[in-house]
Amino acid sequence: MQEIQKNTKKEQYNLNKLQKRLRRNVGEAIADFNMIEEGDRIMVCLSGGKDSYTMLEILRNLQQSAPINFSLVAVNLDQKQPGFPEHILPAYLEQLGVEYKIVEENTYGIVKEKIPEGKTTCSLCSRLRRGILYRTATELGATKIALGHHRDDILQTLFLNMFYGGKMKGMPPKLMSDDGKHIVIRPLAYCREKDIIRFAEAKAFPIIPCNLCGSQPNLQRQVIADMLRDWDKRYPGRIETMFSAMQNVVPSHLCDTNLFDFKGITHGSEVVDGGDLAFDREEIPLQPAGWQPEEDDTALEALRLDVIEVK
């Protein structure tokens, strides 16, 4: 019995550390990009997946101790996909006491009508969903729209654009919506997916499958995701270093004439960004930038416990 109690205490301690790490990551992202301001009404887009559940939980937790006042309203879009469990999210949100709105729109029927059988439906579905969420944000008086994309999503998008789109473009932590009316934020921008997976398992969130529509997964994104996971296993710290690189861009050492005036460089010009060694190899640190040794997370694997609230 004492051994069981000892293990339980250790598990709760490790889970508490995990929640603290996620909370710290979200807090830093919010501060770095000024995501949330005094009086904001945040529309939290809740899909029923691990990422959006985690985002809502951490934002609720931060709300209790933040130096500014902001409110949350959770929004789920019921797209009338066959087998969608309509009762799960309302029951979960009512239990938490979170304000919410379920938006019912038969986008599934529209997509099935417009897209031939066997073709990827994600592009049209995404456009329809985006428009509905923008409209809903206006109706609710939301000042910010929060999406659950995390650090791994941002890196995957960067490599997708480099490999297939020929551009260095990622997924911004904060942006103006394409209709020019809404500010979109990604509070999980600094969070690792593996931390989110462990947290979701520990909290036993009522996960709703993401493939109810029957659409094929994005194979290109899957290839990139597998590549990054392999790198993370074989070369610890590489993921952290690549994400750090996205925050430390040197336009004068790339090739985009829209970002830097290469033609303007003449004899007598000032040295820019430290210049270039030109003929010498640049010194590279032995340890990856931004990397920290992995904490002992073995006790976090496959746990389904209530996490201690961090105040």
Curated annotation (Swiss-Prot):
It is found in: Cytoplasm. Catalyzes the ATP-dependent 2-thiolation of cytidine in position 32 of tRNA, to form 2-thiocytidine (s(2)C32). The sulfur atoms are provided by the cysteine/cysteine desulfurase (IscS) system. Its cofactor is Mg(2+); [4Fe-4S] cluster. It catalyses: cytidine(32) in tRNA + S-sulfanyl-L-cysteinyl-[cysteine desulfurase] + AH2 + ATP = 2-thiocytidine(32) in tRNA + L-cysteinyl-[cysteine desulfurase] + A + AMP + diphosphate + H(+). Homodimer. GO terms for molecular function: 4 iron, 4 sulfur cluster binding; ATP binding; magnesium ion binding; sulfurtransferase activity; tRNA binding. GO terms for biological process: tRNA thio-modification. A motif (PP-loop motif) lies at residues 47-52. Binds 1 [4Fe-4S] cluster per subunit. The cluster is chelated by three Cys residues, the fourth Fe has a free coordination site that may bind a sulfur atom transferred from the persulfide of IscS. Changing C122A: Abolishes formation of s(2)C32. InterPro entries: Rossmann-like_a/b/a_fold (IPR014729), TilS/TtcA_N (IPR011063), tRNA_Cyd_32_2_STrfase (IPR012089), tRNA_thiolation_TtcA_Ctu1 (IPR035107). The thiolation reaction likely consists of two steps: a first activation step by ATP to form an adenylated intermediate of the target base of tRNA, and a second nucleophilic substitution step of the sulfur (S) atom supplied by the hydrosulfide attached to the Fe-S cluster. The keyword NADP does not apply. Pathway: tRNA modification. It is an enzyme of class 2 (transferase). This is tRNA-cytidine(32) 2-sulfurtransferase. Disruption phenotype: Loss of cytidine thiolation in position 32 in tRNA. The deletion mutant grows at the same rate as the congenic wild-type strain, but several specific steps in the translational decoding process are affected in the mutant.
